[in-house]
Every structure is written in structure tokens, then in C-alpha cells.
Amino acid sequence: MTNIRKSHPLFKIINDSFIDLPAPSSISSWWNFGSLLGVCLAVQILTGLFLAMHYTSDTATAFYSVTHICRDVNYGWVLRYLHANGASMFFICLFLHVGRGIYYGSYTFSETWNIGIILLFAVMATAFMGYVLPWGQMSFWGATVITNLLSAIPYVGTTLVEWVWGGFSVDKATLTRFFALHFLLPFIISAMVMVHLLFLHETGSNNPTGIPSDADMIPFHPYYTIKDILGLVLMLMALLSLVLFAPDLLGDPDNYTPANPLNTPPHIKPEWYFLFAYAILRSIPNKLGGVVALVLSILVLAVIPLLHTSKQRSMTFRPLSQCLFWLLVADLLTLTWIGGQPVEHPFIIIGQLASILYFLIILVLMPLASIAENHLLKW
């Protein structure tokens, strides 16, 4: 009799994805982030579900329902801060996961990569809408500023903004629909994650060398299950340390003030994980130009596979490309810092230079470095 995990239609899918899956023997800890993202998503859905049981999406009571969760609900403060800081952990893992994909040339799996980009957009949209729900000052003004960007679209812009708002300003209708969409999107993301995995398992995983590893595969379980559990324990330790010792470290103090349409905060800024894109948006004086640059800052990832000019897949043995990659990382950190600064000298010019450098590295310098490395290999 065959093992039930290999014969049962449902268990067979799980078995082929997480147990008997052939995996390259050389994949490093940079390959842990896929499973960590899965755990982050599960944590967010669970904590979010329990928060939704106590939250009310009405402008009059939203802020106070969150206060009620923190003060009166059993371990409500843990739920709230796990959810808020879980989002930060989600984005840390996302950025590292995408960075790994760029460094090791995983973007040559085009279907997996493109679904990953759509997933990134979906997670960013979900996080933005979630930030609006507590209905603090930064929630309200963040929603106003970001949704207002749609008005830059020629001809239909203003109509589109009012359609998104459900009125002539960010109000009750906006909050209600953002709550509905914020609740719905994670389940759509879960379905897309399955498609992401489906396409990944069509090709098998990449590895640090970038060389096909068909001749040297090992079963996923127990080798990578135990490795993933180690990564999971480390991530949960970091998340719990953040939640229990410094829950407001990554938040904005302005969000502890109830939303007031008559009082604008001195510095409107999004959560830290959007600051790099926000800095690119602000670096262009023209509204439409800024919106285009904002979208392109993420959409540029879709162009990376088309600009792969190297004869090697991974950057492991390509020192020039490695230098440019780490320059890109430093540039993104600079943009993140600038996004949180006021719009004044010298931050304006630093932001503009960092924005230009961001697109220059990805679109021009990396492909040129790859061509140079190809020529160096001939010697």
C-alpha cells in the first residue's frame, strides 16, 4: 500500500510542495524569506481577523475602537502591535526577498517574477489601506495626499479621486470601503501566493551559483524544513522583541491624535517602508511626473529580466555588478532617509540625485557592467 501522503489527492499536493520537493543542495539562508513571508501573511490574517471583530469602520468611532482594543480587550494591545509591527516585518522580508532575486538572477523565472511584482503592489496597497483604518491624523492626511495623486491623471483624474473617496473628501465612505478592501485583499494575496509557488515549482529553485542544479537535489524535508524553522524562530524573536519592548518605534506619534480635517500635521509622511517611493515622488516638481516616477519605482522591476545582458545568471562571480547592487541598496537606504525629512535644502537635491541614481543603476549601469564582465571573461 502506498503512503497516504503520496496517494491522497490533497495530501499529494502538500507532499509535492513541502516534503518530497527536490531542492538544490546549496541554497543559502537568503532562500528562507519565501517561507518567512508565508508566515508573515498568516500572522497578519489571523491578528487582523481578531482585530476586525472589535473594530468599527465609522469616522466617529474608528479611533476609539482601536483605543478600546488596546485598553479593554484581553491581549488586544498584543494583537494591535503584532499586526502593526507584523506589517513592518512583512516588508523587511519582502525587500530582502526581492533583493535576493535581483542578486542571484532569480528574475529569469519570468512568470514567478512577474507574479511577485503584482504581489508586491497588492501588499503595498493593503498596507496603505490598513494605515488609514485607525483614523489618526497621519491616517487621514496620508489617505488624502496619496489618493489625491490620482487627480494627476489627465482628463479623468478629478472624477477618479471623487469616485475612490465616495464623496468630495476623505470621509466615512472612504474609511468603510478601505476597511472592506483591507479585509479582502489578503485573501486574494493568499491565492496569488499559491500561483507564485505553482510557477516556481514548474522550474524548481535557483541557487547561489546560478548554475542548474538538477544533478544535485535533496528533499525539502527534513533539510529545508529545519532550516526554515530556524529562520522563523529568529524572525519571531525579532518581531516579539519589537512588539513587547518598542511597539511604537516604527509608528508615527501623530497617529495618536484623532483625525482632524481642519488641522494639517507639519510633516505628512507614510510608514517607513514606503519612504523610498515617497522620496522619488517628491523629487519631481511636476505632479503627474511624480506619480509616474512613483509607479515606475516598483514597475522598473519588470524590466530587469529584459535588461539581463550577462552570460552568467547570478552575481556571485561578477564583482562589477556586485558593486552596483550594493550601491543600489545604499541608494534605497538614502531615499528612505530622505522620504522622512522635510522638503528643504539640502534634502531636496539629495533626494533628486538619489532618485536619478536609482533608475540609472537599474536601467543603464547594471546592463553595461554585465557587458563589460562578458568582455573581461574572454581574456
From Swiss-Prot:
<dbReference type="GO" id="GO:0006122">
    <property type="term" value="P:mitochondrial electron transport, ubiquinol to cytochrome c"/>
</dbReference>
<feature type="binding site" description="axial binding residue">
    <location>
        <position position="182"/>
    </location>
    <ligand>
        <name>heme b b562</name>
    </ligand>
</feature>
<dbReference type="GO" id="GO:0046872">
    <property type="term" value="F:metal ion binding"/>
</dbReference>
<feature type="transmembrane region" description="Helical">
    <location>
        <begin position="288"/>
        <end position="308"/>
    </location>
</feature>
<dbReference type="GO" id="GO:0045275">
    <property type="term" value="C:respiratory chain complex III"/>
</dbReference>
<feature type="transmembrane region" description="Helical">
    <location>
        <begin position="113"/>
        <end position="133"/>
    </location>
</feature>
<feature type="binding site" description="axial binding residue">
    <location>
        <position position="196"/>
    </location>
    <ligand>
        <name>heme b b566</name>
    </ligand>
</feature>
<keyword id="KW-0472">Membrane</keyword>
<dbReference type="Pfam" id="PF00032">
    <property type="entry name" value="Cytochrom_B_C"/>
</dbReference>
<dbReference type="InterPro" id="IPR016174">
    <property type="entry name" value="Di-haem_cyt_TM"/>
</dbReference>
<feature type="binding site" description="axial binding residue">
    <location>
        <position position="83"/>
    </location>
    <ligand>
        <name>heme b b562</name>
    </ligand>
</feature>
<dbReference type="InterPro" id="IPR027387">
    <property type="entry name" value="Cytb/b6-like_sf"/>
</dbReference>
<dbReference type="InterPro" id="IPR005798">
    <property type="entry name" value="Cyt_b/b6_C"/>
</dbReference>
<dbReference type="InterPro" id="IPR005797">
    <property type="entry name" value="Cyt_b/b6_N"/>
</dbReference>
<keyword id="KW-0479">Metal-binding</keyword>
<keyword id="KW-0249">Electron transport</keyword>
<feature type="transmembrane region" description="Helical">
    <location>
        <begin position="33"/>
        <end position="53"/>
    </location>
</feature>
<comment type="function">
    <text>Component of the ubiquinol-cytochrome c reductase complex (complex III or cytochrome b-c1 complex) that is part of the mitochondrial respiratory chain. The b-c1 complex mediates electron transfer from ubiquinol to cytochrome c. Contributes to the generation of a proton gradient across the mitochondrial membrane that is then used for ATP synthesis.</text>
</comment>
<comment type="similarity">
    <text>Belongs to the cytochrome b family.</text>
</comment>
<feature type="transmembrane region" description="Helical">
    <location>
        <begin position="226"/>
        <end position="246"/>
    </location>
</feature>
<dbReference type="Pfam" id="PF00033">
    <property type="entry name" value="Cytochrome_B"/>
</dbReference>
<keyword id="KW-0812">Transmembrane</keyword>
<feature type="transmembrane region" description="Helical">
    <location>
        <begin position="347"/>
        <end position="367"/>
    </location>
</feature>
<feature type="binding site">
    <location>
        <position position="201"/>
    </location>
    <ligand>
        <name>a ubiquinone</name>
    </ligand>
</feature>
<keyword id="KW-0496">Mitochondrion</keyword>
<dbReference type="InterPro" id="IPR030689">
    <property type="entry name" value="Cytochrome_b"/>
</dbReference>
<dbReference type="InterPro" id="IPR048259">
    <property type="entry name" value="Cytochrome_b_N_euk/bac"/>
</dbReference>
<dbReference type="GO" id="GO:0005743">
    <property type="term" value="C:mitochondrial inner membrane"/>
</dbReference>
<feature type="transmembrane region" description="Helical">
    <location>
        <begin position="178"/>
        <end position="198"/>
    </location>
</feature>
<keyword id="KW-0999">Mitochondrion inner membrane</keyword>
<keyword id="KW-0679">Respiratory chain</keyword>
<feature type="binding site" description="axial binding residue">
    <location>
        <position position="97"/>
    </location>
    <ligand>
        <name>heme b b566</name>
    </ligand>
</feature>
<feature type="transmembrane region" description="Helical">
    <location>
        <begin position="320"/>
        <end position="340"/>
    </location>
</feature>
<dbReference type="InterPro" id="IPR036150">
    <property type="entry name" value="Cyt_b/b6_C_sf"/>
</dbReference>
<feature type="transmembrane region" description="Helical">
    <location>
        <begin position="77"/>
        <end position="98"/>
    </location>
</feature>
<dbReference type="InterPro" id="IPR048260">
    <property type="entry name" value="Cytochrome_b_C_euk/bac"/>
</dbReference>
<protein>
    <recommendedName>
        <fullName>Cytochrome b</fullName>
    </recommendedName>
</protein>
<keyword id="KW-0408">Iron</keyword>
<keyword id="KW-0349">Heme</keyword>
<keyword id="KW-0830">Ubiquinone</keyword>
<keyword id="KW-1133">Transmembrane helix</keyword>
<dbReference type="GO" id="GO:0008121">
    <property type="term" value="F:ubiquinol-cytochrome-c reductase activity"/>
</dbReference>
